[in-house]
Each structure stands twice: as structure tokens, then as C-alpha cells.
Amino acid sequence: MSAIVDLQVASDAANLPSADDFQRWLNAVLAHQQLSEHELTVRIVETQESQELNLTYRGKDKPTNVLSFPFEAPPGLSLNLLGDLVVCADVVAHEADEQHKKLHHHWAHMIVHGALHLLGFDHINDDEAKEMEALEVDILKQFSIDDPYQDQ
């Protein structure tokens, strides 16, 4: 159960997680969901790219922490491609500071959160949100990361 990660860094931000960090976090998501090898792209971007993508795909004219673009295979074609995660380094750093969280822990949370979106989980209604948050908390515990929702 391992992720094949295409890591693209299109950001000059400092203190980014290592490729090994992304690999461990994504492997944990796949293992938790009992999935075999899957491939995905993680792209770390600047604020402008995040804002442009968020406006184009979600109609929101502001940067966001993570965007998930699930891969949809054509009918009859089975591929182990999950899709793409686009993470805005500046937004993640700002949120970590604002929420008094360790930057590394917030990065882990955003990657786990985004990967669960790629697997079809969502938080549109309360029941979905509770399920998704519980999965995130359970996966993050493996890395000794506290419940990111405990202060909300």
C-alpha cells in the first residue's frame, strides 16, 4: 500500500515538508483505506495560482489551502490514478500561524484532507463532515498529531 507521488514545487516558500513527509502522509491515507498502490500529483503553489484555480473551478476569487482534482477514468478503463492536489504554501503557513498549530502538523492535515477528497470523501453536510473529520483525526494520530478540530 503505497502512493506514487509526483511532487511539483512551484513555490519559493520556506519550510516546506520533504518529499518523504508527503510520501508517509499519503501512504497512511491509502493504508487506512486499505488501498493498494495509487498515483497522484501534489503541486505546491504560490497564492496567485491557487487563487486562479479556486476561481476557475470553485467560483471563489481567493486563494485556498488545498484543492483536490479527482481523476475520473473513462468507462471501461481501470487506472490507479487518484488525481491531483494543489496546495498553497502561503495559505497553509498563514492558517497554521493563525490557528496556533505547528506548521508541519497543518501540512500533514491538509495533505490527508485533500487525499480523502480524492477518494470521494466530502464535508458538504454535517454527517459527511463528521465522517471525514474522524478519518482525518485517526490518520493524523499515527504521526502523533493532535485533533486539528479540537478547538473549533
Curated annotation (Swiss-Prot):
Zn(2+) binds at residues 113, 117, 123. Gene3D superfamilies: Metalloproteases ('zincins'), catalytic domain. One of its GO terms (biological process) is rRNA processing. Binds 1 zinc ion. It holds the Pfam family YbeY. It is an enzyme of class 3 (hydrolase). One of its GO terms (cellular component) is cytoplasm. GO terms for molecular function: metalloendopeptidase activity; RNA endonuclease activity; zinc ion binding. It is found in: Cytoplasm. Disulfide bonds: none annotated. Keywords: Cytoplasm, Endonuclease, Hydrolase, Metal-binding, Nuclease, Ribosome biogenesis, rRNA processing, Zinc. Its EC number is 3.1.-.-. Its cofactor is Zn(2+). Single strand-specific metallo-endoribonuclease involved in late-stage 70S ribosome quality control and in maturation of the 3' terminus of the 16S rRNA. Belongs to the endoribonuclease YbeY family. This is Endoribonuclease YbeY. It comes from Pseudoalteromonas atlantica (strain T6c / ATCC BAA-1087).
